[in-house]
């Protein structure tokens, strides 16, 4: 329990920020799932389109500090690799 006004304010800010970050992560997961579903269906065109939509969301997550930039790069790289394998 906070004993100072500033500590109470920090608690309010943390709650607000947590909600924003949770929504952002959920949104990113949704976009990644769409790409994975398109890959699983074997539709390269749909997978490419979903990947194109997911890419800025993932990068935004890195910019906002929700995900580490290396994590985002790794996810994008692996998704792209799987999409390219569809055509081969």
From Swiss-Prot:
Organism domain of life: Bacteria
GO molecular function (one): structural constituent of ribosome
Gene Ontology biological-process entries: translation
InterPro entries found in the cross-reference section: Ribosomal_bS20 (IPR002583), Ribosomal_bS20_sf (IPR036510)
Keywords from the UniProt entry: Ribonucleoprotein, Ribosomal protein, RNA-binding, rRNA-binding
Cellular component, GO annotation: small ribosomal subunit
Cysteine disulfide partners in this protein: none
Matching Pfam families: Ribosomal_S20p
Family, as annotated: Belongs to the bacterial ribosomal protein bS20 family.
Function summary: Binds directly to 16S ribosomal RNA.
Protein name per its UniProtKB record: Small ribosomal subunit protein bS20
Native species: Rhodospirillum centenum (strain ATCC 51521 / SW)
């Amino acid at each position: 329990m906070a004993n100072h006004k500033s500590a109470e304010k920090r608690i309010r800010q943390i709650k607000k920020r947590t909600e924003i970050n949770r929504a952002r992560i959920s949104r990113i997961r949704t976009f990644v799932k769409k790409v994975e579903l398109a890959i699983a269906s074997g539709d390269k065109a749909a997978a490419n389109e979903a990947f194109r939509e997911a890419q800025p969301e993932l990068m935004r997550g890195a910019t906002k500090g929700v995900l580490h930039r290396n994590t985002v790069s790794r996810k994008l790289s692996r998704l792209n690799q799987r999409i390219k394998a569809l055509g081969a």
